[in-house]
Amino acid sequence: MTTSLADWLPAEQGPWHLDFEQWPQAQAQRWRAVLAVGADDRRVLLAERDEDAMLLQSVESRLNAPVGWQRASTEAVTHFLGAGEADFRALSDVEDALTTIEDHTEELSALALSEQASPVVRLLNATIYDALQDTASDIHIECTARGAMIRFRVDGVMAVVRQVESPQVAEQLVSRLKVMAELDIGERRLPQDGRFKLRVQGREIDFRLSIMPSVFGEDAVIRILDRAAIARAGALTLDSLGFGDDERAAIRHQARQPHGMLLVTGPTGSGKTTTLYATLAEIHTGADKIITIEDPVEYQLSGVVQIPVNEKKGLTFSRGLRSILRHDPDRVMVGEIRDAETAQIAVQAALTGHLVFSTVHANNAFDVIGRFMHMGLDLYNVVSALNAVLAQRLVRLTCKHCARPFTPDAATLTRHGVINGNFLKGEGCGHCRGTGYKGRRAVAELLKLDDGLRDLIAARAPMSEIKAAAKARGMKSLREMALAAVCRGDTTFEELERVTLDE
């Protein structure tokens, strides 16, 4: 068996060496392809199959350099992967003395892998590492009769990345996660929630863990909260989130009011907190005192006092908000209004001269009113405090690298009431992993309350009447805003149907 790089690559372009920094071990294992680098930084992928154009484009995009392809034997690729095992280290059980919530911060990097680490630990490490490389928001480990299926949520859409063909390994994966999150590994009949941290290339990343019993064992969902992701992407502004000119102007106007409440609503993962961060970053001048309470603090804002919720120690949203109001704030951000007590305090704060920002889980801007009514709050106080509600969704953007003009069928145009537009559709390439989409942007509807709308809501008018009044004032629905994005070529009719409701 030939196991030397020189046996597979041109000697005149050498000497060759394996590079697990530019093409990490986790990716090499997943695709069964290693990166060899020769003289003059010449790069070649050694793989056990014929050239995969999509994978090659993806690697070239990652490295921002041309990459060649060379097929090698399965035995040789396995040998090269084994040689790279020492270049992938993860998850050392060392408590981080600097953490403020008394959990464990572990290390995950592409420098070395402990030789003593079990195969299950290495599998979990590789899965987490891959998720970070793919900028996934969630990792799903779903138990099956044969083992487990591992899926990532990338740009809001699920994709299968691994199959575990062993029920025992699947069980050990979940047990390992429980240990990391300091949960009860013996409890398999009840749901459990926890969190853990990893330090990756010098930055700290939070993970929320949810364990749920299922027919074939326990399923795990890991939410990834990368505080440094926004900083790496550039300045945090409303402009960077993809809002239209009118939406940005309206949000900025509401954010500069002297008092009241601005709420952002939408499902989990719709960018609510990011929108609030961008809003605070824009209005922060140093002249006002801004305090936030969050679960967790996802992004650190310079000059803003940020408090992490710690329910184990009794620091809840409601208790933290009460304390914040004694610290003479001008503007307050509450990460989420989850219960009646927090809602009541937020409303009172808005009525007593503070500008309050928060998020609420609701399907649209109008449903927020129903949520507060369901909590038992005085509706007159709610509408008196409330300045505006922003409901938003994230739609995937058509990949700029493979987008082509597209003519929808007549039935689609008729159904959406569209005559023409600049319709584009991605064909799929290495930049977008074959999906036709790359990146996301926000679409939103903004309900701005005036005296007329407040009177209708306080009088408990039918929702249809309230919606008609808002539309008469120029409000555009989520569906209308998403349709406008389709007609501009930013996204597709499929995304429109996926993220908005045809009301």
Name each model-derived stretch.
Residues 34-43, 102-104, 109, 325-330, ...:
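Long, low-complexity, intrinsically disordered polar/charged segments
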Residues 12, 16, 74-126:
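Charged, low-hydrophobicity low-complexity segments
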Residues 69-71:
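Beta-strand-loop-alpha "switch" segments that mediate conformational coupling across diverse proteins
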Residues 113-130, 134-503:
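Short, flexible helix-loop junctions that flank or precede catalytic/ligand sites
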Residues 1-65, 74, 83-86, 107, ...:
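Polyanionic, low-complexity intrinsically disordered segments
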Residues 4, 15, 19-22, 76, ...:
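Exposed alpha-helical structural elements
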Residues 13-19, 52, 56, 98-103, ...:
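Poly-acidic low-complexity segments
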